[in-house]
């Protein structure tokens, strides 16, 4: 990309954070969690193979959703394509249909004496045909494929009613991997809450994760028929997802007056299993951030409207009830955790961050947060500590999902009003049962759902997606309601798009190649001439001592809004940053001429962090981005000094070497620092 090309679109806000999606407070009567969790928990959930000694089937998995508010009315907009109402009783085929979804046809060339397979599907998070599902909508497209390297319940409809002792065979590269006896339709797993049967003609078996890989094909034989035509599933990514939990204890909250770290630092084991059942990943790894927690006495809220809609300047908060709207502190914390994730080199990776916010009011009492925020596609979200509907909804935003009802209205979601009317069924391996698209009788929403949900021809309620009022649509015993197949496919796409730290790769990184159905070595590159960082902000040093420093700054001079947060130290990563006292580093970021000619071109490089260690040594780091007009790094933005504008407020986060204790942190005024470092720069802030 040449230096003279048209500038790329500016990112949504001045701090570099994705736009958050605000969610109405979710009703909750949960007390403080009392589950005991080891300090600094790090749990690893791999897909589990549960093949019985007889090699007949057990069940596998998708665990449903639970979420936020704003369910549509039953009289909402019509589906993009007509939905077919699900039949009431047992059926020989999957109940329901999938508007807008396309399934790959099964092989059909069968010779005499050969077993025919009418349908083959794999139940993981959802019941997905071997060729996958795909959608083409007016303003979006998506696909959902069987998940590679994850156990699956295979479901087979056999064409011959007299087949005796059918067996599923797995083959790869001409070699037989093994065979599984198929359980008869009478042994099919039940449906949640004792609901209608998924089907009455499906034979089944649990396929181990080792067989659920590209290149494997499956055929079915019987003692009285030869093997069927083989089907090779089209697989989605085999990537894992890491969930990093970083609790924020705010305004004096601690283990004596609030839910303790032992219960906030990670979901309990059962909840982790349910999250894994929900997300389309081969493995879920849950860890508490190596810092443990981040305790803050003060939080700075950026310019935003108050409860009445009136614009307010940035301001400091020392108790939750001081915020001027219900999402002020959450918004500030989402910006912090998003920027900290980037500073640690986790931005492009398959790592989702979640920050439980534990806060006190001005009376010193624990305050119920009542909601959450997630940066759409950012990989980061904040919310309460209970790991229920708020959590799964906000992490949905982090995966790139918006509110499903809004997306339906825009032609970017296939099912009316953000519902599951038309989705394939889900499946949960932990309960070993199918998840209907209809609200189950044991759901808390069941009794009154007709006034707020889409209805089928018999007046029964369809579930809402967790991204549109699904909280309460799950069966008793579940924490989360059921995502639609479409939104699960979009989560799978987010996972597939991530860079994977991969020791098996020659470069140390890999990415999923959907066409090849395989990981390919990935070499980090600097996009957009360094506009958003170097080498995609991947680590240049990993697993080293670091100090994370967060600075908020109001160029408008709003009272108390310019603030250096207390640093915290842990074992983390360092990304490429620049020392303005080095001529070589200044040359590298010189606008339009340096190695990274756009590094400072977006909104300037006018501020420097100076860190003085306890031994007197110092380190300097340029803070990328400031208050310049977009693509004019020598001219201030028109609203740079307008206290009511987000253009007057900035939050930076940066990691610096942490092998020595910090003595002082200073923010320096260094205008257009690529031209030279001032001999005696003005100190704007000091801690």
UniProtKB/Swiss-Prot annotation:
EC identifiers of the protein: 3.4.24.-
Keyword terms: Hydrolase, Metal-binding, Metalloprotease, Protease, Zinc
Residue ranges crossing the lipid bilayer per the database entry: none
Peptidase M66 domain mapped to chain residues: 233-501
Residues forming the catalytic site: 394
Top-level class of the enzyme under EC nomenclature: hydrolase
Cofactor: Zn(2+)
Binding annotation for Zn(2+): 393, 397, 403
InterPro entries: Dictomallein, Peptidase_M66_dom
Region Disordered: start-end pairs: 1-45, 73-112
Family membership: Belongs to the dictomallein family.
Protein name: Dictomallein
Originating species: Burkholderia pseudomallei (strain 668)
